[in-house]
Amino acid sequence: IGPSGVETTVYAGDGEYLMXLSIGTPAQPFSAIMDTGSDLIWTQXQPXTQXFXQSDPQGSSSFSTLPCGYGDSETQGSMGTETFTFGSVSIPNITFGXGEGPLPLPXQLDVAKYITLDLPIDPSAFDLCFQTPSDPSNLQIPTFVMHFDTGNSVVSFVSAQCGA
């Protein structure tokens, strides 16, 4: 660690910057998205079902679990400390979240019985349906924001009946 901090390889991805690092003892190499929106490092850890390279905290002799809760509930998993290696520099006891996968949108909104998110075969489209519960006066759906990375494409929204 020098006066300018730790250095590692950074390269451009598809709309994000990626950095090379290793996690654990023995070190497992990964590419990670650089996210300046959070000061906590999140990795996808086993037994997540997504198709990304995954950290295995239980296979590391330097992993230690910490109790936690995360404010916006966008992931589920555990929190711990681990040795991170950037280039040739290893730093022990870095706090990070070991996510077991992103929570689906209905679970994030805590309205799973009122909302469905269908991902069709066409990867350029999806359906988001809000359904009326048996007692509509008790429905409380929080405000949320969805971000779409469309490149140079046009996004259009069509009102339709759910299940249509």
Curated annotation (Swiss-Prot):
Which N-terminal residues, if any, form the signal peptide? none
Identify the keywords attached in UniProt to this record, alphabetized.
Answer: Aspartyl protease, Glycoprotein, Hydrolase, Protease, Secreted, Zymogen
pH-dependence annotation: Optimum pH is 2.6. Retains 95% and 79% of the original activity after incubation for 30 days at pH 3.0 and pH 10.0 respectively.
Listed SUPFAM superfamilies:
Acid proteases (SSF50630)
User: Which Gene Ontology cellular component annotation is one that this UniProt entry carries?
Assistant: extracellular region
Summary of activators and inhibitors of this protein: Inhibited by pepstatin and by diazoacetyl-D,L-norleucine methyl ester (DAN) in the presence of Cu(2+) ions.
Similarity annotation: Belongs to the peptidase A1 family.
Q: Which named protein is this?
A: Aspartic proteinase nepenthesin-1
The organism is: Nepenthes distillatoria (Pitcher plant)
Q: What is the lineage of its organism?
A: Eukaryota, Viridiplantae, Streptophyta, Embryophyta, Tracheophyta
